[in-house]
Amino acid sequence: MTKFSEPIRDSHVAVLAFFPVGAHAGPLLAVTRRLAAASPSTIFSFFNTARSNASLFSSDHPENIKVHDVSDGVPEGTMLGNPLEMVELFLEAAPRIFRSEIAAAEIEVGKKVTCMLTDAFFWFAADIAAELNATWVAFWAGGANSLCAHLYTDLIRETIGLKDVSMEETLGFIPGMENYRVKDIPEEVVFEDLDSVFPKALYQMSLALPRASAVFISSFEELEPTLNYNLRSKLKRFLNIAPLTLLSSTSEKEMRDPHGCFAWMGKRSAASVAYISFGTVMEPPPEELVAIAQGLESSKVPFVWSLKEKNMVHLPKGFLDRTREQGIVVPWAPQVELLKHEAMGVNVTHCGWNSVLESVSAGVPMIGRPILADNRLNGRAVEVVWKVGVMMDNGVFTKEGFEKCLNDVFVHDDGKTMKANAKKLKEKLQEDFSMKGSSLENFKILLDEIVKV
């Protein structure tokens, strides 16, 4: 890692993680670790729920990262029906919880907080930072496309609301969004009531982010250049900070691989394997899991399927026995490392930003089935903007539809084009990390913004 000169400062950074979605807290911690290593005299107080912290801090961390467990905001005895309910309860309680915990951390550390480094969802951090006379730096856990959609919420609602718009109509009135359609935008941006908890929080975020000293995302400059330019016109400072894990390699001996995925992959030919995973929040419904299994079995494509144990009951009877030589189904897999394996041929994904970025960094094409939030925007980028993958017809898995997508990638000429385009994006990412690229300079700018007093 490039060494930066250590500033002589007495900084205390409060890091506020968004726990209900692991795709948010993990990348924020990764950046925090990198910042802590670059500025060892700065204290980073990392606030997150006990359960989330337990999974994130399973290994050692720098001494200047102080871990603080906070309440999840769910009243004792409350029965939750879906993940969104947990998100809403947490967002409602978060301002009170964080104010109290930050005050306690200041006493414990003996330093006033000088910077708030938070998930962008926490719009109220702008007010807390002002109260503390601290700077606010926000992390958006998605791509430039979804951030742009949120920052243009008012214009999108005004423009679409003025006419009987087709869901297929493109967003040509927003620079950089010309290839995206109305149907790709998250519902909370366009259609949902802004008085309900989650859409209201996201709308308040869109109004608050221009107050932040800096906003950064996990990405690299050449992935969405026009959108980057657009966002720099809306925000005080906008930075792409590509995670180091995308380029670093882990030896098989060092890797956590409890189910032997790497050993299995080592027996397969180059670019032949389909990897299937849909993140940590939601899986496709049972009938689609059946369709995936049927499509895999019929296609004969080798596969590694990361599927939660509770959902394995939905697999067709006898599927695991019949496909024992063809593939493996495991409750967890080392996704980042597997995607880099030479045998990997395609990533079958929900198109969450982290998954998309991991595929891009590995030069692996994608088959997408968007599920929620920014997934449709990312899927559109994969299929139409970057041309590195294909989406499921009508956004759902069917046996025939999945087989067609597998053939598109592994058999037809379209697959060769996807692979070539994916390779080009991988090379652009590698160049971005070189001395000629912007990643190191952007990280230095972020570091200076966060540790200044």
Curated annotation (Swiss-Prot):
What is the protein name for this chain? Flavonol-3-O-rhamnosyltransferase
Active-site residues annotated for this sequence: H24 (proton acceptor), D119 (charge relay)
* Protein family per UniProt: Belongs to the UDP-glycosyltransferase family.
Free-text disruption phenotype from the record: No visible phenotype under normal growth conditions, but mutant plants exhibit altered flavonol glycoside patter.
Please indicate if the UniProt record lists Oxidoreductase as a keyword: no
The cross-references to Pfam families, in alphabetical order and at most eight, read: UDPGT
CDD domains, alphabetized: GT1_Gtf-like (cd03784)
Q: What organism is the protein native to? A: Arabidopsis thaliana (Mouse-ear cress)
Keywords, in A-Z order: Glycosyltransferase, Transferase
Instruction: Write out the pathway annotation from the protein's UniProt entry.
Output: Flavonoid metabolism
Cited function: Flavonol 3-O-rhamnosyltransferase that catalyzes the transfer of rhamnose from UDP-rhamnose to the 3-OH position of kaempferol and quercetin. Possesses low quercetin 3-O-glucosyltransferase activity in vitro.
Task: List ligand-binding residues for UDP-beta-L-rhamnose.
Answer: T280, A333, H350, N354, S355, E358
Specify which residues bind an anthocyanidin according to the UniProt entry for this protein. H24, H150, A373
SUPFAM superfamilies in UniProt: UDP-Glycosyltransferase/glycogen phosphorylase
Top-level lineage group: Eukaryota
Q: Which reaction does it catalyse?
A: kaempferol + UDP-beta-L-rhamnose = kaempferol 3-O-alpha-L-rhamnoside + UDP + H(+); UDP-beta-L-rhamnose + quercetin = quercitrin + UDP + H(+)
- Tissues expressing this chain: Expressed in leaves, flowers, siliques, and stems. Expressed in the shoot apex.
Tell me which positions the record assigns to the signal sequence: none
E.C. number(s) listed in UniProt: 2.4.1.-
